[in-house]
Protein backbone atom coordinates (compact mmCIF):
# COMPACT_ATOMS: atom_id res chain seq x y z
CA UNK A 1 0.00 0.00 0.00
CA UNK A 2 2.72 2.48 1.01
CA UNK A 3 6.44 2.25 0.43
CA UNK A 4 8.34 4.59 2.72
CA UNK A 5 11.80 3.11 3.17
CA UNK A 6 10.96 -0.14 1.39
CA UNK A 7 12.60 -2.43 3.94
CA UNK A 8 9.68 -4.89 4.05
CA UNK A 9 9.48 -5.01 0.25
CA UNK A 10 13.18 -5.73 -0.03
CA UNK A 11 12.93 -8.38 2.70
CA UNK A 12 10.26 -10.14 0.62
CA UNK A 13 12.32 -9.85 -2.54
CA UNK A 14 15.41 -11.35 -0.87
CA UNK A 15 13.37 -14.18 0.70
CA UNK A 16 11.65 -15.06 -2.58
CA UNK A 17 14.92 -14.96 -4.49
CA UNK A 18 16.32 -17.52 -2.02
CA UNK A 19 13.37 -19.71 -3.00
CA UNK A 20 14.39 -19.37 -6.66
CA UNK A 21 11.88 -16.73 -7.73
CA UNK A 22 12.81 -15.65 -11.24
CA UNK A 23 11.34 -12.17 -11.05
CA UNK A 24 9.94 -9.94 -8.33
CA UNK A 25 7.61 -7.00 -8.90
CA UNK A 26 6.11 -4.83 -6.17
CA UNK A 27 3.04 -2.63 -6.39
CA UNK A 28 2.11 0.21 -4.08
CA UNK A 29 -0.53 2.89 -4.04
CA UNK A 30 1.75 5.48 -2.49
CA UNK A 31 5.44 5.36 -3.44
CA UNK A 32 6.69 7.84 -0.87
CA UNK A 33 10.32 6.68 -0.65
CA UNK A 34 11.25 8.97 2.22
CA UNK A 35 14.61 7.18 2.09
CA UNK A 36 16.05 3.99 0.65
CA UNK A 37 16.29 4.63 -3.09
CA UNK A 38 19.90 3.49 -3.11
CA UNK A 39 18.93 0.16 -1.51
CA UNK A 40 16.41 -0.40 -4.31
CA UNK A 41 19.02 0.58 -6.90
CA UNK A 42 21.35 -2.08 -5.50
CA UNK A 43 18.60 -4.72 -5.30
CA UNK A 44 17.67 -3.96 -8.91
CA UNK A 45 21.27 -4.15 -10.11
CA UNK A 46 21.75 -7.46 -8.29
CA UNK A 47 18.55 -8.91 -9.76
CA UNK A 48 16.50 -9.10 -6.58
CA UNK A 49 13.76 -6.82 -7.89
CA UNK A 50 12.52 -6.50 -11.45
CA UNK A 51 10.42 -3.43 -10.89
CA UNK A 52 8.16 -1.41 -8.65
CA UNK A 53 4.80 -0.03 -9.80
CA UNK A 54 3.40 2.98 -7.97
CA UNK A 55 0.42 5.22 -8.64
CA UNK A 56 0.40 8.92 -9.32
CA UNK A 57 -1.83 9.55 -6.29
CA UNK A 58 0.93 11.27 -4.34
CA UNK A 59 4.07 13.26 -4.98
CA UNK A 60 6.90 11.27 -6.58
CA UNK A 61 10.30 12.88 -6.47
CA UNK A 62 12.22 13.46 -9.70
CA UNK A 63 14.90 11.12 -8.30
CA UNK A 64 12.35 8.31 -8.01
CA UNK A 65 10.90 8.91 -11.46
CA UNK A 66 14.38 8.61 -13.01
CA UNK A 67 14.91 5.11 -11.63
CA UNK A 68 14.81 2.36 -14.29
CA UNK A 69 13.02 0.00 -11.90
CA UNK A 70 10.16 2.42 -11.07
CA UNK A 71 7.03 2.41 -13.23
CA UNK A 72 4.33 5.00 -12.69
CA UNK A 73 0.71 3.87 -12.90
CA UNK A 74 -1.64 6.65 -13.98
CA UNK A 75 -4.93 6.29 -12.11
CA UNK A 76 -6.28 9.78 -12.83
CA UNK A 77 -9.11 8.31 -14.94
CA UNK A 78 -10.34 6.36 -11.91
CA UNK A 79 -10.13 9.39 -9.65
CA UNK A 80 -12.35 11.19 -12.17
CA UNK A 81 -14.81 8.27 -11.98
CA UNK A 82 -14.87 8.50 -8.18
CA UNK A 83 -15.51 12.24 -8.25
CA UNK A 84 -18.23 11.89 -10.90
CA UNK A 85 -19.91 9.11 -8.91
CA UNK A 86 -19.97 11.24 -5.78
CA UNK A 87 -21.32 14.26 -7.69
CA UNK A 88 -24.06 12.17 -9.32
CA UNK A 89 -24.85 10.23 -6.16
CA UNK A 90 -24.30 6.83 -7.78
CA UNK A 91 -22.34 3.82 -6.66
CA UNK A 92 -18.82 3.57 -8.05
CA UNK A 93 -19.37 -0.14 -8.65
CA UNK A 94 -21.83 0.64 -11.45
CA UNK A 95 -19.26 2.91 -13.07
CA UNK A 96 -16.40 0.41 -12.82
CA UNK A 97 -18.39 -2.77 -13.51
CA UNK A 98 -16.89 -4.17 -16.72
CA UNK A 99 -19.68 -6.66 -17.48
CA UNK A 100 -21.85 -4.33 -19.54
CA UNK A 101 -18.85 -3.02 -21.46
CA UNK A 102 -17.77 -6.57 -22.24
CA UNK A 103 -21.29 -7.55 -23.35
CA UNK A 104 -21.44 -4.51 -25.64
CA UNK A 105 -18.07 -5.34 -27.21
CA UNK A 106 -19.05 -8.97 -27.72
CA UNK A 107 -22.36 -8.04 -29.34
CA UNK A 108 -20.50 -5.91 -31.89
CA UNK A 109 -18.45 -8.92 -32.99
CA UNK A 110 -21.14 -11.59 -33.34
Positions of predicted regions on the chain:
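PRPP-associated nucleotide enzymes
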Residues: 2-110
